[in-house]
């Protein structure tokens, strides 16, 4: 997968799971991330159609997929599935796909939702969407740092 670069256009982030996929999208300048929706997974064909619709409606130019790693940085049981999903997206949509370390995003998303006093029932889908926002915002912030030129003295 590719490293962050300076491509303009909206970026779609996915918090990939076996039952749900949380989605977030950037603004056109690639500065901020907003939660979009949570897709309930059914099968590859249905998932593909739903993602194609999101990509077309939002004029997506790049995709970021959360990479589930262990706290140590080692691969988890879900890491290979996420990599396979990212490769599938890259093949299906012919768009650049980046993998992004998603450690702590679900923990942080759950903390934020608990503090907002959202009911446990509503948290299920919201946590995936918020995790996608956190993945995308971290990606965008890193890209912004990489774009900055050194200060001249």
Swiss-Prot record:
SMART domains: YqgFc. Its EC number is 3.1.-.-. InterPro entries: RNaseH-like_sf, YqgF, YqgF/RNaseH-like_dom, YqgF/RNaseH-like_dom_sf. GO terms for biological process: rRNA 5'-end processing. Keywords: Cytoplasm, Hydrolase, Nuclease, Ribosome biogenesis. Pfam families: RuvX. One of its GO terms (molecular function) is nuclease activity. It is found in: Cytoplasm. CDD domains: YqgF. Gene3D superfamilies: YqgF/RNase H-like domain (3.30.420.140). One of its GO terms (cellular component) is cytosol. Belongs to the YqgF nuclease family. Could be a nuclease involved in processing of the 5'-end of pre-16S rRNA. NCBIfam families: RNAse_H_YqgF. This is Putative pre-16S rRNA nuclease. It comes from Koribacter versatilis (strain Ellin345). The lineage of its organism: Bacteria, Pseudomonadati, Acidobacteriota, Terriglobia, Terriglobales.
């Amino acid at each position: 997968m590719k490293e962050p670069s300076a491509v303009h256009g909206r970026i779609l982030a996915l918090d990939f799971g076996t039952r749900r996929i949380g989605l977030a999208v950037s603004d056109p300048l690639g500065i901020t991330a907003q939660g979009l929706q949570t897709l309930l997974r059914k099968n590859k064909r249905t998932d593909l159609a739903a993602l194609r619709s999101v990509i077309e409606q939002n004029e997506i130019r790049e995709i970021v997929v959360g990479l589930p790693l262990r706290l140590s940085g080692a691969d988890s049981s879900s890491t290979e599935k996420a990599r396979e999903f990212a490769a599938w997206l890259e093949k299906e949509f012919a768009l650049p796909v980046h993998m992004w370390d998603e450690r702590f995003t679900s923990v942080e998303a759950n903390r934020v939702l608990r503090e907002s006093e959202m009911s446990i029932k509503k948290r299920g889908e919201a946590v995936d969407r918020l995790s996608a926002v956190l993945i995308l915002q971290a990606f965008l912030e890193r890209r912004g740092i990489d774009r900055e030129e050194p200060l001249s003295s």
